[in-house]
């Protein structure tokens, strides 16, 4: 199922859809179907423009960032969290143009918030970093081990930083996390955790965690919204804005897909 989802998902996201729209438009124009060719071209360019500009991106981001309440370290039950669970956000393997393995930007921001929170809670709640490798053809995990190294260098005791290296997506992150917590805290049900991930990823992560029987306390990081006001430049297409819009739509596609599969 993991492989099937990986192969199907691009066909529901803007980069592939826009490419298919342009190819379809070209096919129509070559067949001299000018009216439909013009309609498809206009629609394709319009979608690209909207997703690349500030106001539409803002609506997409806020639809996710405001979907989950932030409990600021506690939940309605008042139970003490058993672990600070950080979900992986990606890492880059070293190669000819990259001298060393590196965490992605979202991973850094998630990890940093986890380290901050650990110290804010006086080191009384251990950290569990969950994430193997989500790539189809590169199964060797590097991300969790990278974060462990950074955490130990920053002064976190090795006994307080656990890692999980077998999961490949959010569903497996939560599943493997629950297995570790079941083993470490066998008498606890449900497991209360502080859940850290990117703000737009939090709604899907919380829904999966609750479905798995966990009691997550959302602690989002890596926020995308920068401002609630827009200037002239926000109405010009931006590659960064298009990327962020695509990330948001990726989350909505994931939520719908997981809902259909019964994982939420």
Where are these regions (language model features)?
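Membrane-embedded alpha-helical segments of integral membrane proteins
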Residues: 1-29
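Membrane-interface helix-boundary motifs at transmembrane edges
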Residues: 29-37
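A structural signal for short, hydrophobic/glycine-enriched beta-strand patches
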Residues: 45-46, 50-236, 245
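Structured C-terminal subdomain patch of bacterial secreted/periplasmic proteins
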Residues: 238-264
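Central hydrophobic cores of alpha-helical transmembrane segments
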Residues: 38-45
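Structural signal for membrane-spanning alpha-helices in multi-pass inner-membrane proteins
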Residues: 26-29, 48, 52, 258
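Extended, histidine- and acidic-residue-enriched regions that form the cofactor-binding/catalytic faces
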Residues: 15-17, 54, 262-263
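Hydrophobic alpha-helical segments of integral membrane proteins
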Residues: 3-8, 56, 60-64, 249-256
């Amino acid at each position: 199922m993991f492989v099937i989802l990986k192969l199907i998902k691009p066909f529901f996201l803007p980069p592939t859809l826009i490419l298919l729209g342009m190819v379809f438009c070209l096919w129509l124009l070559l067949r001299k179907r000018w009216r439909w060719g013009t309609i498809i071209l206009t629609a394709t360019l319009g979608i690209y423009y909207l997703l690349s500009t500030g106001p539409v991106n803002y609506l997409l981001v806020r639809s996710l960032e405001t979907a989950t309440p932030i409990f600021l370290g506690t939940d309605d039950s008042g139970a003490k969290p058993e672990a600070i669970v950080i979900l992986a956000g990606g890492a880059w393997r070293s190669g000819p143009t990259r001298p060393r393995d590196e965490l992605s930007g979202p991973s850094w921001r998630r990890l940093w918030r986890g380290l901050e929170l650990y110290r804010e809670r006086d080191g009384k709640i251990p950290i569990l970093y969950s994430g193997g490798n989500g790539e189809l053809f590169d199964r060797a995990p590097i991300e969790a081990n990278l974060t462990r190294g950074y955490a130990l260098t920053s002064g976190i005791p090795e006994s307080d930083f656990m890692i999980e290296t077998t999961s490949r997506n959010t569903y497996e992150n939560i599943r493997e996390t629950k297995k570790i917590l079941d083993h470490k805290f066998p008498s606890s049900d449900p497991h209360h955790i502080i859940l850290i991930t990117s703000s737009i990823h939090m709604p899907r992560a919380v829904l999966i965690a609750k479905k798995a029987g966990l009691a997550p306390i959302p602690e989002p990081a890596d926020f995308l919204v920068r401002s609630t006001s827009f200037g002239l430049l926000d109405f010009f297409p931006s590659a960064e804005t298009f990327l962020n819009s695509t990330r948001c739509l990726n989350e909505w596609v994931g939520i719908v897909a997981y809902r259909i599969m019964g994982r939420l």
